[in-house]
Amino acid sequence: MATRRYSFGRTDEATHPDSMRASLAEFASTFIFVFAGEGSGLALVKIYQDSAFSAGELLALALAHAFALFAAVSASMHVSGGHVNPAVSFGALIGGRISVIRAVYYWIAQLLGSIVAALVLRLVTNNMRPSGFHVSPGVGVGHMFILEVVMTFGLMYTVYGTAIDPKRGAVSYIAPLAIGLIVGANILVGGPFDGACMNPALAFGPSLVGWQWHQHWIFWVGPLLGAALAALVYEYAVIPIEPPPHHHQPLATEDY
């Protein structure tokens, strides 16, 4: 991962083949993640019909999202960094790890991947409407906003610790697994309340295809804010600042 550097991007970055390859990788990985994650929810609806949401279903959703994200990040990490999430890309931008141009390319690719995944799901499930995300009845909107901020903070902090930190060492080999596990764990926490989104792309595609926009803003503003906070905390409080090099003449022997 590159060192911290805030920039809009080079003039040739918009058309460079590496940018195109990275954007394609983000599109494909986001498609994989949304198809499996949202698809698992539709499958449970098909199996259990109108029965009450159970702990077993929650566990199944958590595992499906964790495994899918593990695979999606693994498949694209060496090409694009394996963001698979506009909030992660935003956090990397706030932390000075990617340029504005690269972030915009990733956002477009991630949203398109989510839309295509939701469209394919609607096609192959005989027109079942993707459910997207919403706040559960009796749960305060403000509380869910804070929950999304906190859960995405944990996700972005994990991304930094395993995939971005220059001194991460061998822990980078388990980055995709760690990222998938934190998402699965957060779904066990937040799933009964608002679905535990943490990813604007995961919310956007199903909401567009299913045309369900109620309280949709929570699943954008909360994750973006949480990722930005985690990036700032890790960049400026956790990653050590290298001291500037000292240029001096060695003391003569008689000066010791």
Curated annotation (Swiss-Prot):
InterPro entries, per the entry: Aquaporin-like, Aquaporin_transptr, MIP, MIP_CS
NPA 2 (motif): residue ranges: 199-201
The keyword Phosphoprotein is assigned to this record: yes
Membrane topology: Multi-pass membrane protein
GO cellular component terms, A-Z: vacuolar membrane
Record key words, sorted: Membrane, Phosphoprotein, Repeat, Transmembrane, Transmembrane helix, Transport, Vacuole
Gene Ontology terms, MF aspect: water channel activity
Location (main, coarse): membrane
Chain segments annotated as transmembrane: 25-44, 58-77, 103-121, 144-164, 170-189, 217-239
A biological process from GO: seed maturation
One Pfam family hit: MIP
Post-translational modification Phosphoserine, affected residues: 7
Annotated compartments: Vacuole membrane
Recorded superkingdom: Eukaryota
Cytoplasmic side: 1-24, 78-102, 165-169, 240-256
Sequence ranges on the Vacuolar membrane side: 45-57, 122-143, 190-216
Keyword Hydrolase: no
Range of residues in the leader sequence: none
Modifications after synthesis and translation: Phosphorylated by a tonoplast-bound calcium-dependent protein kinase.
UniProt note on tissues of expression: Found in all seed tissues that are alive at seed maturity, but not in tissues that lose viability during seed maturation.
Positions of short motif NPA 1: 85-87
Protein purpose: Channel protein in tonoplast. These proteins may allow the diffusion of amino acids and/or peptides from the vacuolar compartment to the cytoplasm.
Family assignment from sequence similarity: Belongs to the MIP/aquaporin (TC 1.A.8) family. TIP (TC 1.A.8.10) subfamily.
Domains: entry comment: Aquaporins contain two tandem repeats each containing three membrane-spanning domains and a pore-forming loop with the signature motif Asn-Pro-Ala (NPA).
Protein name stated in the entry: Probable aquaporin TIP-type alpha
Organism, as annotated: Phaseolus vulgaris (Kidney bean)
